[in-house]
């Protein structure tokens, strides 16, 4: 690929925006040329706008330090500099919906980390290994928006990445009822311990809106396209509790599953480790070679050992055992700001590019 596609990051100064910038450093297909944020950051260099709030483990890439932050509300101006944008803006749901559609209407594809459009019927919400065929609704969305190349695609909530991939791998055994509890890292709230000290040695048994997303979003991902919109699946029915725990990165899930065709442990493990999707077939730059690993040890997966499996793009499953009430239970772990946020969105963009939806303007 000769020319890299020019990328803009909307909401570039926040934690997910920073993760986009660090993940896209030296990307073989994409180059960050534009950073946009709130009017209060506009006009400053990216380095000055972020100041002491850089939250990544790796240093700020030199290539973005001197980029002048643009005002995210100046849609035409920002859009004129890029081939597509990643959206991680921090606004109200209605404002996000409006601004993402405004960018799409400038013929600029939007790959969003935000939840605002996850239930817009003709907007695909995609985990690329699971439901890349949902990108087909984009043509219907373009008709609605009146665009030729502009559209919105979104990635799902970070909480579901620790159990939805396993349930997808087990589809042939017909899971129909799932109970899950997620133990979610503070970076999911855009925080570190430095700016959320009350989370140290603490657990908060509530994360606003998270349980509804964790129960409903997998059903949309497993849904079918009918008449140009995505109709959610009816099963498996999921009930979920979401807990904030004093961990920086990594969402863990404890899940219990009932199957119509109860499998053996060997069948379940085989289905997990053999599960592949379009990103693996196409060998996309951010795709994990192994999407799901199974760990036999009783004390795995652990955040410290396993959260960075496949550079944070893989999912780790362990403790698979028969249950007294349900058929099987397991523990899952995924990296909430890589696979669960910016990394998942970058993989969506790579899939969209490989399938011809995103091209140079």
List PLM regions with ranges.
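Charged docking surfaces used in two-component/phosphorelay signaling
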Residues: 187-361
């Amino acid at each position: 690929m000769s020319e890299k596609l020019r990328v803009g990051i909307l909401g570039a100064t926040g934690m997910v925006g920073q993760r986009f910038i660090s993940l896209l450093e030296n990307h073989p297909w994409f180059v960050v040329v534009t950073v946009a944020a709130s009017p209060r950051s506009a006009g400053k260099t990216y380095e000055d706008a972020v100041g002491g709030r850089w939250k990544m483990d790796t240093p700020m890439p030199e290539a973005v330090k001197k980029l002048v932050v643009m005002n995210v509300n100046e849609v035409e101006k920002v859009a004129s500099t890029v081939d597509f944008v990643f959206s991680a803006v921090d606004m109200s749901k209605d404002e996000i919906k409006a601004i993402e559609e405004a960018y799409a209407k400038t013929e600029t594809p939007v790959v969003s980390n935000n939840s605002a459009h996850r239930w817009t019927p003709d907007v695909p919400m995609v985990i690329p290994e699971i439901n890349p065929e949902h990108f087909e609704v984009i043509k219907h969305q373009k008709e609605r928006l009146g665009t030729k190349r502009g559209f919105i695609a979104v990635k799902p909530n970070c909480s579901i990445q620790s159990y939805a991939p396993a349930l997808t791998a087990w589809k042939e055994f017909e899971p129909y009822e799932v109970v899950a509890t997620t133990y979610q890292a503070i970076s999911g709230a855009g925080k570190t311990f430095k700016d959320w000290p009350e989370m140290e040695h603490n657990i908060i048994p509530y994360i606003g809106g998270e349980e509804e997303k964790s129960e409903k979003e997998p059903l949309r991902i497993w849904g079918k396209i009918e008449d140009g919109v995505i109709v959610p699946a009816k099963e498996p029915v999921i009930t979920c509790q979401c807990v904030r725990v004093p961990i920086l990165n990594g969402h863990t899930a404890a899940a219990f599953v009932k199957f119509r065709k109860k499998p053996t442990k060997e069948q379940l493990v085989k289905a997990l480790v053999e599960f592949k999707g379009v990103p693996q077939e196409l060998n996309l730059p951010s795709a994990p070679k192994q999407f799901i690993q199974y760990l036999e040890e009783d004390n795995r997966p652990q955040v410290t050992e396993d959260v960075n499996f496949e550079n944070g793009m893989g999912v780790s499953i362990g403790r698979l055992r028969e249950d007294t009430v349900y058929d099987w239970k397991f523990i899952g772990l995924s990296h909430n700001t890589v696979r669960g946020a910016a990394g998942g969105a970058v993989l969506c963009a790579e899939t969209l590019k490989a399938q011809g939806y995103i091209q140079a303007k």
